[in-house]
A protein has these predicted regions:
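Active-site-proximal cap/loop segments of hydrolase catalytic domains
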Residues: 1-178
Length: 178
């Protein structure tokens, strides 16, 4: 698309602002969750949400665009979505994309985050999740890493799904439930 961190992020924030105006929504107990591209969105929004969210959960999200470029098995995706490689300084689309990599905004993170990943993920390598978890912890953010050694981009094994759901909803309960 060439518009990572662009219109979609503005749409997310506009949508949550509109939803938060509804009388049945407690704007002080909003969470933000996403997987894959949604997981990337969580990382980006963690540095740009201006207090809207009280908890984040990212499942297999992209955290560092440059590291991702050299470690995924799907370069055609990144060449299309990012606009090209990070070393192509003449490519304005690519440079705009890399300038907005979520890892560059960790200094603005201030909200608890759970990070879920599968060690067998070749689409978005689990090291992306490890980097985000480490950054959050070093920045003093309450963070939890849930890592499945026998899963890839999706959690498919029934016993792991039970753990995934327990962890996911436990995190939301911890930070959003009254």
């Amino acid at each position: 698309s060439g518009d990572y961190s662009g219109q979609n992020i503005r749409d997310y924030l506009s949508a949550i602002d509109d939803v938060a105006k509804e009388p049945w929504v407690d704007k002080d107990r909003l969470g933000c969750v996403g997987a894959s591209y949604g997981g990337y969105s969580v990382y980006f929004l963690a540095g740009h949400h201006d207090g809207r969210f009280k908890a984040f959960i990212s499942h297999c999200g992209i955290f560092d665009f440059e590291a991702m470029y050299g470690s995924t098995e799907e370069l055609f995706f990144l060449n299309n979505d990012y606009g090209g490689p990070y070393w192509d300084k003449q490519n304005a689309t690519a440079m705009r994309t890399y300038a907005n990599s979520p890892h560059k905004f960790v200094d603005k993170w201030d909200t608890p985050i759970m990070i879920i990943t599968g060690e067998l993920d070749f689409r978005i390598p689990y090291t992306q999740s490890l980097e985000a978890f480490t950054a959050a912890r070093l920045h003093g953010i309450d963070a939890r890493l849930v890592e499945f050694e026998d899963e890839d981009h999706q959690v498919m094994k029934p016993q792991n799904s039970v753990v995934w759901n327990r962890e996911f909803f436990g995190w939301l309960d911890k930070y959003l439930k009254k």
